[in-house]
Structures are given as structure tokens and as C-alpha cells.
A protein has these predicted regions:
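Acidic/polar-rich alpha-helix caps and helix-coil junctions
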Residues: 1-117, 149-383
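Short, cationic low-complexity segments
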Residues: 120-145, 199-206
Length: 383
């Protein structure tokens, strides 16, 4: 069953946590806290019990407690970087205090191109490489707007588009400028290299933004020409401490202990607010505020849940978590089909797009694996 498979995965992480050391002599090797962080993530997904159409029918309280138990082992072993940007810079910034587990890359191992991050070679903009894939949506950009109190515009954030020409009209979350490249602003903080509209692949179709987190500056020693593509050797953080804090907060909220989750979410927000060192020259209005129960927000369980989900979207944007979060919460269909419907008004390539609930939450199981299991595995619904 689905629950059996989650338990098998959790069992592997539990076993790893028992035998791995608290620290490793070689950089990049998994340690005890990494195992506990992944155990927490596994138990969090397992807690959301779903029917065959992936609707959440129960949130298992015992599993949520296991999330708290596992994250407790990570608390204090890592901490947030002083600046959000430091998680996404190469060289001395890699393997920092927030990185719980990272995939290691290099460009100096003696081979022609080194151990480059080939998974991101297509994410470099056309202006400095190829091929401008993995692009932030306009919807995501708009989500970084905040109100006069520095809180998210939960319900009306997408009523107008945020771009370079309208930045002065909005107050925004500083994380926008560490996540999204906007024409007219420096590329990866380089004042001598302004991100241009002509760097973009088919802008009239796909928009003018690009992803910043996995990229480096054009003159960086970590950017390597592997003609016709450009790769870089910057590590990719697979799980970081901010994610652990938000997983713990999510478990607390679903246990009805949202008041205990509040300082965890605020810890992430307060770090985001002070992450302005590298963007201080940008002529923009940035600044967000912590949630203050009874002052700027009424911190009920429902409100806390919405705030937590919003925080995960902004904090972890373009890091590969969003779709899986939506599936875990059982809201992939409603979220994505609403998105397709709204975006199709401006982005014509979304016309006719839809998310097939009960099928597209998961990929099909390869037939070879079903054969190897001697039909113990049953093909996912809809395939």
C-alpha cells in the first residue's frame, strides 16, 4: 500500500540516522542530521492520507508527531544564513550553515569539464549561454508583493503584474530579487551586467523573467562553456534548514498548535527581511514584517495554514518543491487549473491546458518495475 511504501522509505532514513556520524570528515557526505531531515520530510508526506483521487481524507496525528521528533534532532545543528542570497552563491558560500544536504559539483577534477551541474545547463539565459528554461511565472513574481504592513497579498496579489516599470508602485518581499531575474536589474548582483530583455527565449510567449538561484555571474570562474551549453559547478542544496523549520511549523499547525509554529515562520520571514545587502543599490521598495497575533493578523489555524503554505512558496521558489507540496496538500488540481485558466488570458500557450486530477499527481510506474515485482506493484490510476 501507499502507507507501506512510505514506511519503508522512513525505515531507511531511521536506520541511516542510527549509523551515520553527527559530522563527516569529507564535505558533502550525508550525516545524522541529514537523515533526520529526510525522515521528517517522509513522515510529513505520509501524514496526509489520501484517496485514489489524491484528496486528503485524514491527516495522521501520529505521523505529525514523528515529524516533530525528527526535526527536533536537526534544530540547533544548523541555522539560517544571515542573508538568503548566500544559499545560492558559489565558492566559499557553499556548504554553509543552512545547507543540510547538498549535491557537490566542481570544475577542477582534471577532466575536460569537471563534475559540473549538468541538470541546470538549460537554465542559463540566452544572453550568456543557453537555453533559458526553468522560468519563473508572472504569477510567482506577483506573489512577492506585500501590503503596507509588510504582509502578503493573499487574495489579490495577481490582480496586476509586477515588472521593472512598475516596481516603484509596489512594496515587495526581498526574496524576489534573489529568485527572479527582471530586465533592467543586475544579473546575479553584478552592477556591470544588467539583465536584458534580449537575453530571453521567445519573450512574447514565455515572458521576460529568468531563474537566479541555480545560476552564476557571466564572468564567474564557476561558469564553464560546454558548447553549445554553459554549465556551472555551484552546489545544489537539496534540503536546507529553512525547509526543516517550515516542515516543523506545518506539523505544529496541523496538530492545532499554531502558536508554536508562529515563531518558526517568523524566523524565516525575519531573515528574508534583512536579506538586502546584495540588492541595496536596487531602486526598489522592499520590506516584510513578522506575523504578530492580535496586531497585524488573527492567527487561527486556518490563517496559519495559509501563511505557512505561502511562506513555502516564496522561500523555496524554483527549488523544485512547489508541485509536490500541492500534491501533499491535495490541492494540485484546484491550484493548477485555476492558474491555467487565469494565465491563458495572456499566455496563449496555456489555452486548453488542464491538470487531470487523480492521474497526474504521479507519473506511471515503469512496466519493467511492475514485472520485476511479479505484479506486487499496481499501476498508478489513469495509466
Amino acid at each position: 500500500s501507499n502507507d507501506d511504501l512510505w514506511s519503508a522509505i522512513a525505515g531507511d532514513f531511521e536506520a541511516a540516522a542510527q549509523v551515520l556520524p553527527s559530522s563527516q570528515p569529507q564535505v558533502g557526505r550525508a550525516d545524522k542530521t541529514a537523515a533526520y531531515a529526510y525522515l521528517a520530510k517522509t513522515r510529513l508526506y505520509q501524514a496526509y492520507e489520501q484517496d485514489e483521487n489524491h484528496n486528503v481524507v485524514n491527516i495522521n496525528q501520529e505521523r505529525l508527531q514523528q515529524v516533530l521528533d525528527a526535526t527536533e534532532q536537526v534544530m540547533g545543528m544548523h541555522q539560517l544564513e544571515e542573508d538568503f542570497a548566500y544559499n545560492f552563491l558559489p565558492g566559499s558560500f557553499e556548504n554553509g550553515q543552512e545547507a543540510v544536504f547538498s549535491i557537490q559539483f566542481s570544475n577542477n577534477d582534471g577532466t575536460l569539464h569537471g563534475r559540473l551541474n549538468y541538470s541546470d545547463v538549460l537554465a542559463t539565459p540566452q544572453g550568456i549561454g543557453c537555453c533559458d528554461f526553468h522560468k519563473p511565472s508572472q504569477n510567482l513574481v506577483n506573489a512577492y508583493k506585500v501590503d503596507e504592513q509588510g504582509l502578503p497579498l493573499f487574495s489579490n496579489y495577481n490582480q496586476s503584474n509586477l515588472d521593472f516599470n512598475s516596481l516603484e508602485n509596489y512594496r515587495v518581499d526581498p526574496r524576489l530579487y534573489h529568485t527572479v531575474a527582471i530586465p533592467g536589474l543586475p544579473w546575479k548582483y553584478d552592477q556591470e551586467n544588467i539583465y536584458q530583455e534580449n537575453w530571453v527565449r521567445s519573450p512574447s510567449t514565455y515572458g521576460y523573467t529568468a531563474s537566479l538561484k541555480e545560476n552564476v555571474t557571466e564572468d564567474s570562474e564557476y561558469l564553464v562553456n560546454i558548447d553549445p551549453f554553459y554549465g556551472n559547478s555551484k552546489n545544489r542544496i537539496e534540503i536546507r534548514y529553512a525547509d526543516v523549520l517550515l516542515m516543523r511549523a506545518e506539523a505544529l499547525i496541523e496538530l492545532g498548535r499554531q502558536n508554536e509554529a508562529l515563531p518558526l515562520i517568523n524566523e524565516v520571514r525575519e531573515r528574508a527581511n534583512q536579506s538586502t545587502t546584495l540588492i541595496s543599490s536596487y531602486a526598489t521598495n522592499t520590506g516584510i514584517s513578522p506575523y504578530l497575533d492580535g496586531e497585524n493578523i488573527n492567527w487561527t489555524q486556518d490563517v496559519a495554514r495559509e501563511a505557512l503554505r505561502w511562506e513555502r512558496r516564496l522561500e523555496l521558489a524554483m527549488e523544485g518543491n512547489r508541485f509536490f507540496d500541492l500534491v501533499r496538500w491535495g490541492i494540485a488540481e484546484e491550484t493548477l487549473n485555476k492558474y491555467y485558466s487565469e494565465e491563458a488570458e495572456e499566455a496563449t500557450y496555456y489555452e486548453g491546458a488542464f491538470f487531470d486530477e487523480g492521474r497526474e499527481e504521479y507519473l506511471p510506474i515503469p512496466q519493467a518495475q511492475i514485472n520485476f515485482s511479479q505484479d506486487v506493484y499496481v499501476q498508478n490510476t489513469g495509466y
